[in-house]
A protein has these predicted regions:
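Sec-dependent N-terminal signal peptides of Gram-positive bacterial secreted proteins and lipoproteins
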Residues: 1-12
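A residue-level marker of the well-folded mature domains of exported/periplasmic proteins
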Residues: 12-183
Length: 183
C-alpha cells in the first residue's frame, strides 16, 4: 500500500524534471533496531523496485532517527536537501511532526507517515500528508475473537477448571498507540 501511495504521490511533488525519469524516495524510520520496521522498510524497497520501468527509475534512500526526534528531523532535512520527491516517515514521536511537516511543505514534498499515526490535527495541516497503517482497534477485536474461538474449542486451556482463563497480556512497544488500542 505504501509503495502504491509513493507512486501516486510522486505526481504531487513540486519537482517536475526529475520525477519524469527518476523518483527519489526518502524513508526515515524511528529506529534501525526494530525488526518489524526493518521488515516493512525492506518490503517497501522490494515493492518500489518492482514498480520500476523504462520510463521511471526509483531510488530509495533510508535513514534512521535512532530513537531521537531531533535526529530524525535532521535526517528528514538531509533527505529533502538530497532531492527526495516523496518522504515516507515512521515517526519517533507521533506528537511532534510539526517541523517535518513544515520542511516538507516548504519544498512541496508529499509525506506518507507509516506505522505511527500523527495526531489528527497534524495530519490536517496540509493536503499532502498521509498515513498508512492498520486499524489497531479492529486488530485487537480480531485477536480476541481468535483467542475466544481457540478457548471454546479447547476446554483443556482452563487448567484449573474454574471457568476462567488466566493469561498474561503482552502489550508490545510501550506507548505505541496501536499497541495500546489493540490491548
Amino acid at each position: 500500500v505504501t509503495g502504491s501511495a509513493v507512486l501516486v504521490l510522486s505526481g504531487c511533488s513540486g519537482k517536475s524534471e526529475q520525477t519524469e525519469k527518476t523518483l527519489r524516495v526518502g524513508v526515515i524510520t524511528y529506529s534501525q533496531d526494530d525488526p518489524f520496521i526493518n521488515g516493512l522498510t525492506d518490503e517497501l524497497k522490494v515493492q518500489l523496485k518492482a514498480m520500476e520501468n523504462k520510463q521511471r527509475r526509483i531510488i530509495v534512500s533510508t535513514k534512521s532517527g535512532n530513537d531521537d526526534q531531533q535526529e530524525q528531523n535532521e535526517k528528514v532535512e538531509e533527505m529533502i536537501d538530497a532531492g527526495c520527491d516523496v518522504l515516507c516517515i515512521n515517526l519517533v514521536d507521533r506528537t511532534a511532526p510539526s517541523r517535518i511537516i513544515r520542511m516538507a511543505r516548504n519544498e512541496d514534498i508529499p509525506v506518507i507517515f507509516f506505522n505511527r499515526e500523527p495526531v489528527r490535527e497534524d495530519l490536517m495541516q496540509w493536503e499532502k500528508l498521509y498515513y498508512v497503517g492498520c486499524d489497531a482497534e479492529q486488530s485487537g477485536i480480531m485477536q480476541g475473537e481468535i483467542a475466544a474461538e481457540y478457548i471454546n474449542s479447547h476446554p483443556k486451556v482452563d487448567k484449573n477448571e474454574d471457568g476462567k482463563i488466566q493469561y498474561v497480556l503482552l502489550e508490545g512497544e510501550a506507548g505505541h498507540q496501536d499497541a495500546i488500542s489493540r490491548t
